[in-house]
Amino acid sequence: MLPEPANSSHSSSTKKRSRCLSTSMQYKYLRRILKYRHMDFEFALWQMLYLCISPRKVYRNFHYHKQTKDQWARDDPAFLVVLSIWLCVSSVGFAFALKLHFLGFFKFLLWVVFVDCIGVGLVIASLCWFFCNRYLRISTAYNAGQQVEWAYAFDVHLNAFFPLLLILHVIQLFFIIDHPLFISRFIGNSLWLIALVYYIYISFLGYSALPFLRSTVVILYPVLLVVVAYIVSLAVGWNIGQSFMQFYKYRVV
């Protein structure tokens, strides 16, 4: 049997080390959720602000984090905690808009947190993680063993989800219009268009920030589908916001 090439052996050991390090970091991340005094909430709020006005600055900070902590993903759960608080507050507004009782509000809150945010995020992060590592990763001696961390893919989702949350759970509250008029559909559906396109754009920035990925522009391709769906929704008279309100009110709660 021929001996295994040295570079292949090195790559394999690097990947094993990377997986062990990732598991250890995820354990520490979950453990820190119970230690709120160790969380940097001020920095989490700074990130949320710049995700809305200059998201590239947020990902430049991820570069610095990689250099100092040897991982791309966050090791501080403060961002997730603050995002959960935002979800709770915005859900109160939706409870008033939908005229929910306390139990209905509680069921709605659980759905928004564990399905809309975390559940959908787990699916999207896993798909992006697999796709990027399988098709976009550059295999060179310099980048040997470097992969997209699953935790980083989930962080990218959380980053993209926050502006979407502001648009659909806060701004949209002022434009919940049930009238069967074109202007009603135009305002509501336009908010959905902006939210989804911005979600895709911030996701693109997150993966394009990784130096070992190529052709990350493909992540922007779903924007075309979103625009087509937006035009079709206006043409056929579908009020997206109204449909989701009815879904939450009659199916979730």
PLM region spans:
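Charge-rich, low-complexity amphipathic helices
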Residues: 77, 81-84, 218-219, 225-229, ...
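Transmembrane helix-loop boundary segments of multi-pass membrane transporters
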Residues: 108-109, 183-189, 248-253
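Membrane-helix and juxtamembrane interface regions of eukaryotic multi-pass membrane proteins
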Residues: 1-145, 178
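Juxtamembrane boundary at the C-terminal end of a transmembrane helix
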Residues: 235-253
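Generic structural signal of hydrophobic/aromatic residues within well-ordered alpha-helices
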Residues: 29-30, 93, 127, 170, ...
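Hydrophobic alpha-helical transmembrane segments and adjacent short intramembrane/lumenal linkers
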Residues: 129-240
